A protein has these predicted regions:
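Active-site loop/oxyanion-hole signature of alpha/beta-hydrolase fold enzymes
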Residues: 13-14, 18, 22-26, 32-34, ...
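Flexible "cap/lid" loop of the alpha/beta hydrolase fold
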Residues: 124, 128, 134-154
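Catalytic nucleophile serine of serine hydrolases
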Residues: 82, 117, 141
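Conserved HGGG/HGGXW glycine-rich cap/lid loop of the alpha/beta-hydrolase fold
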Residues: 30-81
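Conserved catalytic-core motifs of eukaryotic protein kinase domains, centered on the activation segment
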Residues: 56-58, 82-88, 149-151
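Gly/Ala-rich beta-loop-alpha elbow adjacent to hydrolase catalytic centers
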Residues: 115, 119, 123
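Structural signature of beta-strand start/N-cap positions in the alpha/beta core
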Residues: 43, 70, 110-112, 133-136
Length: 154
């Protein structure tokens, strides 16, 4: 496959997904689900980077489903097909609608959580406030300098 993601690939994956919605702001938080739930295997939740949507994960979805994961991939609040949160568009504003959505969709069962870039910061904030939501956290392409005090270079 070339480095470019072709629209037909996105269309194929979108058609295979099961779509769920949970409340967010004045509308919905949209969740895309691939794969089947399996006993003893936690759902894998993928949070995309900023200015994106579930399509940030296009190249990973087939392999993760083939490996036996059930994937829950939201369009973060204010991105993709999801409504903006009422409290703004920064990572802090993502925590409440994501927590509510995860509890509505997965109940009290913990997931494994993967966050890419802005989604990594969001995942960290989510689990700092609600550590019971996930057993594992994976950060992909995090920005460690974002947490350095002003004027610090490392």
């Amino acid at each position: 496959m070339s480095d470019l993601v072709i629209p037909s690939e996105v269309q194929r994956l979108a058609a295979q997904a099961v779509r769920h919605t949970t409340p967010c702001g004045a509308g919905d938080l949209v969740w895309h689900v691939w794969g089947q739930a399996r006993p003893g295997v936690r759902p894998l939740v993928l949070l995309h980077g900023g200015s994106g949507s579930w399509t940030h994960w296009v190249r990973n979805l087939d392999a993760l489903v083939a490996a036996g994961h059930q994937l829950w991939v939201p369009d973060l609040p204010g991105f993709g097909d999801s409504a903006a949160p009422l409290s703004g568009g920064d990572a802090d504003a993502m925590v409440a609608p994501l927590r509510e959505g995860l509890q509505m969709l997965l109940g009290n069962a913990p997931c494994d959580l993967v966050g890419f870039s802005f989604g990594g910061m969001t995942a960290g904030l989510l689990l700092a406030a609600h550590p019971e939501l996930a057993e594992r956290l994976v950060l992909v392409g995090p920005r460690p300098w974002a947490w350095c005090p002003t004027g610090s270079s490392s």
